[in-house]
């Protein structure tokens, strides 16, 4: 019986699956829209929404350290979460991302999906949030 099985395994061992989800979440936070397979997108959605909730509710040193430990020490993604996304979603109580079904992949006919952040900045498409040498935050072309 399959009682209590809630997560998808994605044909990966635990370490590889968690690493895949962390890397996908960093990409989604940086670019605010990514194209991936539908099962990965469905598994990624609650994972990223928990990060946004932590950034929104715990905008302290403890929250920063929690996010750094869960996002492969990606300081740029954590800075964007705490400075940009937390203020953007301050009035929203949940549902920070949406999944739009896409076509199938040509090679293996896998169902593809676009996962994006709601109310994303469309003008920032293809740009990455980064720091300059003086410590200020800038948006650069990727």
From Swiss-Prot:
Keyword Ribonucleoprotein: yes
Keyword vocabulary terms for this entry: Ribonucleoprotein, Ribosomal protein
GO BP annotations listed: translation
GO CC, alphabetical: cytosolic large ribosomal subunit
GO molecular function: structural constituent of ribosome
Claim: Ribonucleoprotein is one of the keywords in the record: yes
PANTHER family: LARGE RIBOSOMAL SUBUNIT PROTEIN BL17M, RIBOSOMAL PROTEIN L17
Family to which this protein belongs: Belongs to the bacterial ribosomal protein bL17 family.
Subunit structure: Part of the 50S ribosomal subunit. Contacts protein L32.
Protein name (Swiss-Prot/TrEMBL): Large ribosomal subunit protein bL17
Species, as recorded: Wolbachia sp. subsp. Drosophila simulans (strain wRi)
């Amino acid at each position: 019986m399959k009682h209590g099985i809630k997560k998808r395994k994605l044909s990966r061992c635990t370490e590889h699956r968690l690493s895949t989800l962390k890397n996908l979440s960093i990409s989604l936070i940086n670019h605010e829209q990514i194209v991936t397979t539908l099962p990965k997108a469905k598994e990624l959605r609650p994972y990223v929404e928990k990060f946004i909730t932590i950034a929104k509710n715990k905008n302290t040193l403890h929250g920063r350290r929690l996010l750094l430990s869960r996002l492969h020490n990606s300081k740029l993604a954590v800075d964007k979460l705490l400075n940009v996304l937390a203020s953007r979603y301050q009035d929203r109580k949940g549902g920070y991302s949406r999944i739009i079904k896409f076509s199938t992949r040509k090679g293996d006919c896998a169902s593809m999906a676009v996962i994006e952040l709601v109310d994303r900045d469309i003008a920032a498409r293809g740009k990455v949030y980064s720091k300059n040498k003086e410590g200020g935050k800038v948006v650069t072309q990727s």
